[in-house]
Amino acid sequence: MEFVLFSQMSSFFLVSTLLLFLIISHSCHAQNSQQDYLDAHNTARADVGVEPLTWDDQVAAYAQNYASQLAADCNLVHSHGQYGENLAWGSGDFLTAAKAVEMWVNEKQYYAHDSNTCAQGQVCGHYTQVVWRNSVRVGCARVQCNNGGYIVSCNYDPPGNVIGKSPY
């Protein structure tokens, strides 16, 4: 009787553990889907009256390839490629798709649309790329670095942040 009870408890524990693992895995994946990237971007764009971005698999492949190259040391160095680009880094599971875009959009507080400038000593180019009216396609990737952190790369087509031009 004790063996049967132990066996049932072991089976229950195993099934419970597997179920928890699947829920956590799905939750982590669900927080980094194409739709998560699009929703975060398009909410910011709608706030300033800019049309939504669409997902582009070719742009996403570029983002994935470049982010994978950065994974060795996790240094945020821009690719200077054919697309506009935003990069973010975070430790652990903190850096989700939505969190990366939120970090970029939080730069809005430093952007003055009337003068098309950033506040002195501040950065706002990530924000302006997110809301750049002429950028209509996006592709993003999230890669774990060798040091355990994560890099998120989003690329935009056509690129934004054209000097002297307003994003919207």
From Swiss-Prot:
Induction: Synthesized during pathogen infection or other stress-related responses. This is Pathogenesis-related protein 1C. Residues 1-30 form the signal peptide. Gene3D superfamilies: CAP. Residues 38-156 form the SCP domain. Keywords: Disulfide bond, Pathogenesis-related protein, Plant defense, Signal, Vacuole. Probably involved in the defense reaction of plants against pathogens. It comes from the Eukaryota. PROSITE patterns: CRISP_1 (PS01009), CRISP_2 (PS01010). Belongs to the CRISP family. InterPro entries: Allrgn_V5/Tpx1_CS, CAP_dom, CAP_sf, CRISP-related, V5_allergen-like.
